[in-house]
Amino acid sequence: MASIMNAILSQFDSDTLDQLSGQLGTNQQTTGNAIAAAVPLLLSALSRNTGDVQGRDSLYNALSNDHDGGILDNLIGFLGGAQQGPGQGILGHVFGGSQNGVVNALSKATGMDASSMGRLLVTLAPIVMGFLGRTRQQQGMGPSGLAGLLGGETEYAQQAAPGLMGTINRFLDQNGNGSAVDELAGML
């Protein structure tokens, strides 16, 4: 099975990056690098959320009821109104009160200013959920299958970009134990 992360990243072609960069006030390279850092982090946080039955079922129900992937049918159109979309609410569920810390960590890791990074995450969250919802639907996944998919995505991200994921983990690892998992758990 192809990586969800790669499928999401492949949606950001030159035209899409140009539009998004214009909205964020950044260049395409900075935007592309920030997307490449933010998508695996979002997938990892969602994976962590599926670590218990309640979180797994909650994510499954959200995907089943609200995120069928239709957003992907007109991505350029969505980008035009993304700040009014469901992204802020999704981020609130995923990161809770630690959202600002996540934004600041990604900002430091990528060089994108925190304000632009926050707006980028608001834009990316519904896209990631749309991909997961569409994949869940196409593959007939139940809650356990979804948790397995997200766990595989987290492993793939670690293997594909160990340096980047290591940098992000260092910024998120507030207690210095070498893992951001406990901090992500506290965020969820």
Say what each PLM segment does.
Residues 1-188:
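A structural "flexibility-hinge" signal
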